[in-house]
Amino acid sequence: MADATEALVLLARLRAGEADAARAAIEAHWPAGGSPFAAAGGTHLARLQIMTPPARPRHRAPGEHLLLAADVDAPLDAWIERLRRAAAGPLDAVLGHCAFYPGAAEPAAFVRWVAANRLSVGFSVIGSPGATLAEVGAALDLRAEIGAFAEAGQRMTPSELHTAWRAWRRA
């Protein structure tokens, strides 16, 4: 059975001196309460941040990079296109600080840039790689319903519990 999820790890070099502007753009366009990643649909989890490599003795200061990591419903290419369409403004505001970023307006150039900056993924932290985001959500809803039923059942007689169970199963 094929996994229902795929992962993307993108590491793009920032243009010299633009790390602070990129951080400000992330803060402005990726607010804690409403990430543009959600607008793409099928996003299990995603992260966007500036990475500063450690300094090495006798070497010039390393360049900073932008990390975009996401675990999403498969197929990944469809998610990337949905993200490009749904979050073009925020993507351009943040990724525009990266070297050679072409912008989200031109789909083919955007896809080529993502591919050029993509890293292979060795693992995923998704607990249910065989389930889509909708399936995970439905399972969590069912778990909550069963929990509520079990709690309510503590106060029922055996006859009431049987009747409630039959009614719940039909719903």
Language model segments and positions:
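Conserved short beta-strand edge segments in small beta-sheet-based binding/regulatory domains
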Residues: 89-103
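Short S/T/G/P-rich N-terminal loop/turn motif that feeds into the first structured element of a domain
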Residues: 1-55, 62-65, 70-78, 106-171
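Low-complexity, intrinsically disordered
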Residues: 60, 84-86
